[in-house]
Amino acid sequence: MSHMTPQEIVHELDKHIIGQEAAKRSVAIALRNRWRRQQVGEPLRHEITPKNILMIGPTGVGKTEIARRLARLADAPFIKIEATKFTEVGYVGRDVDSIIRDLVESAIKQAREHEIRKNKPLAEDRAEERILDALLPSARDSGFDANPSEENNATRQKFRKKLREGELDDKEIDIEITMSQASMEIFAPPGMEELTSQIQGMFQNMGASKKKSRKLRIREARKLLTEEEAARLINDEELKLNAVQNVEQNGIVFLDEIDKITSRSEVSSSDISRQGVQRDLLPLVEGTTISTKYGMIRTDHILFIASGAFHLAKPSDLIPELQGRFPIRVELDSLSADDFKQILTNTDACLIRQYQALLKTEGIELNFSEDAIERLAEIAFSVNEITENIGARRLHTVMEKLLEDISFNATRYSGSTHVIDAAYVDERLGKLSQSEDLARYVL
């Protein structure tokens, strides 16, 4: 679990997301409260439940980006899912219980990667010993714990030095590698993912891994042997137990597009299904027990963050019980022309820096003047005003159209420097941005 303070979390989010201070603060406090709860003693700790968050705002203002960046900062089991993927039990489609199953799978994968990183130094040492055994088969008795004979020790150390310096990387050796059986893929019918997963696991357990001798270059052999030794060092039962506990205590679920499962004033059969999804979500958000192949998972302390544009619906269109499960509501603001300018220049991976890096691979130096950046921001903002407001995503469309000629003829322009100024921006985009019809279909 991340030990970052709310200020540190907001500072990290500021590197990638412009504005939306209220949303960043709410998410930062919620993430910090996960850590605070762990410091509280029992039985009070069990009574402290997370305060779920509902983020409301138009498309393209940073709701999903906050979730993506939060996933990297959280250092906890995290899953982002679209609410529209799920249907009421009895309808064709995925049921909401699969959210928790997917979260557990994510936690298992995360825990395995963490263990592999932790065991890598020891795994590399073991892989090195196996390569030396293959190079000097008589220098060692069988088994890792056996000591090399005194007379061959000097030779072994010489080979070890050459191996570490990369002098033997292209030499071929015969090594035994554990070959896992090819996994049998079973396509799950809607609503039967858990049963299919159990059947697939049964078939995998039936096929035992076999050892196979292969002739490989030392460079390739080292990589394969390190992976094999790292996997051997993992205690699978302990890993699964810790991952399940981590999900129950620190898991975070990001429910995107929750406004798409709201019911509107006019009732239709699809609205009934949407209400069913909301009712199915209720016990999950409130706290229930879900059966998975790794055991029973309690959802009482899993944090749920929901988001939606709420263009055609209002948060009050959610069923009252579900509204009550998201006590913290945050409204995200529409982006201004100044916000667009900051998005173009002030984030760590801003669009201008991305396009400069892409075209540099073709030998093209791309420079943007200050007035060009301001003009791009103005055009993106005005097109959003006169057509559909798609937020920061409009900048991608504008930048692609602006640099279309340079990107297409990159080989011809190789070795040159291009300065993008306001005049060039107007030449490429001026007419398009001024005509509502052209802007609607081109930008």
Swiss-Prot record:
Superkingdom, natural source: Bacteria
Biological processes per GO annotation: protein unfolding; proteolysis involved in protein catabolic process
Molecular function terms from GO: ATP binding; ATP hydrolysis activity; peptidase activity; proteasome-activating activity
Entries under InterPro entries matching the protein: AAA+_ATPase, ATP-dep_Clp_protease_ClpX, ATPase_AAA_core, Clp_ATPase_C, HslU, P-loop_NTPase
Keywords for the protein's UniProt record, in alphabetical order: ATP-binding, Chaperone, Cytoplasm, Nucleotide-binding, Stress response
Binding site for ATP: 18, 60-65, 256, 321, 393
GO cellular component: HslUV protease complex
Subcellular location: Cytoplasm
Keyword flag Kinase: no
Function of the molecule: ATPase subunit of a proteasome-like degradation complex; this subunit has chaperone activity. The binding of ATP and its subsequent hydrolysis by HslU are essential for unfolding of protein substrates subsequently hydrolyzed by HslV. HslU recognizes the N-terminal part of its protein substrates and unfolds these before they are guided to HslV for hydrolysis.
Xref: NCBIfam families: hslU, PRK05201.1
Family affiliation: Belongs to the ClpX chaperone family. HslU subfamily.
Subunit and partners: A double ring-shaped homohexamer of HslV is capped on each side by a ring-shaped HslU homohexamer. The assembly of the HslU/HslV complex is dependent on binding of ATP.
Protein name: ATP-dependent protease ATPase subunit HslU
